[in-house]
Amino acid sequence: MAFQQHGNQEVRNRKILQGLEEKKRQMMNQQQGGGAGPLPGPSHVARPPTDAGNTSASRIHEPIVRYPNQTHQLAISQRQALEHAHSVSPGFYITQDSMYGNLILPVIPRVESE
């Protein structure tokens, strides 16, 4: 009798796993543009102003164009970089979307002089 209950649990577990795999496949298709609807338009992220004497200043004022799936990938990259930095360094880091491509920045506390 216990064997039969174990078999039923196995069948339920397989059905749950199959359902999860199907949902995963559907989500992957939607992310890759295989979804039923069109992809949402790009989101614009304005860059911060820089020094006017810089020769590349005109380029920097252009907005960064990102599509939603690129933003998701950036978030994954930031999280991985942050976890790696925390695991190999005793310092404290924050995620930052900088115009120089830095995914994380170290936080350096201010120490008041005595």
Swiss-Prot record:
Domain of life: Eukaryota
Pfam family, one: SOSSC
Ranges of biased composition (kind: Polar residues): 1-10
GO CC annotations, alphabetized: nucleoplasm; SOSS complex
Gene Ontology terms: biological process: DNA repair
Annotated spans, Disordered: 1-61
Family label: Belongs to the SOSS-C family.
PANTHER family: SOSS COMPLEX SUBUNIT C
Name of protein: SOSS complex subunit C homolog
Organism: Nematostella vectensis (Starlet sea anemone)
